[in-house]
Amino acid sequence: SFIVTANEGAVTQWRSFGGMRLVRQQGWEILADSKFAETAERMGNEAVELLTADNCPSDTRDLILAPDQMILQIHESIGHPLELDRILGDERNYAGTSFVTQDMIGNYKYGSDLLNITFDPSRPEEAASYAFDDDGLEAKKEFIIRNGNLERVLGGGISQFRAGIEGTANSRADSWRRPAMDRMANLNLEAGDTKFE
């Protein structure tokens, strides 16, 4: 990964590339696939653009997010709130709870009809991939949001049993001596047929 910094007087802007977006279960080929070298010039230009850009307007507008910001948005606004142990209150003293409640599953409009989010830990190239979660459930692709509607939450076998609802195979522990927790893995915004422009 790398960071590019642009500075003029008391104003500094920076852009970065790599980090978590380059975490894969791959080797050297990830650098070629990511066009790592070619990206350096683009990041430099973006840092200068940020440095010289006008301040963002403060009125209400429609917003289209580019992929690099969309990754974070999905992680924070969809992933964590849909972890069933948070919904059940298990995380309230550590990482907080969720605005999502059990009665919202199947009844909540999470976004526009264009929003389709899948959970897919079966993708072999991704860092958060596995065949079975730590509750022994088989990992497979599942829609959690389809056409903007919340269909299911991210809850492993134990949380599913406690809540009496269907979830996903996402119960994972970071060690044999720690309890498994419901954690997102490989959330994907499914491609539609709308052009970015």
Q: Where are each of the predicted segments found?
A:
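Internal alpha/beta scaffold segment
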Residues: 2-86, 152
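Short N-terminal signal/transit or membrane-insertion segments
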Residues: 62-93, 161-173, 181-182
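Dual-mode signal for accessory low-complexity, basic/Gly-rich regions
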Residues: 92-197
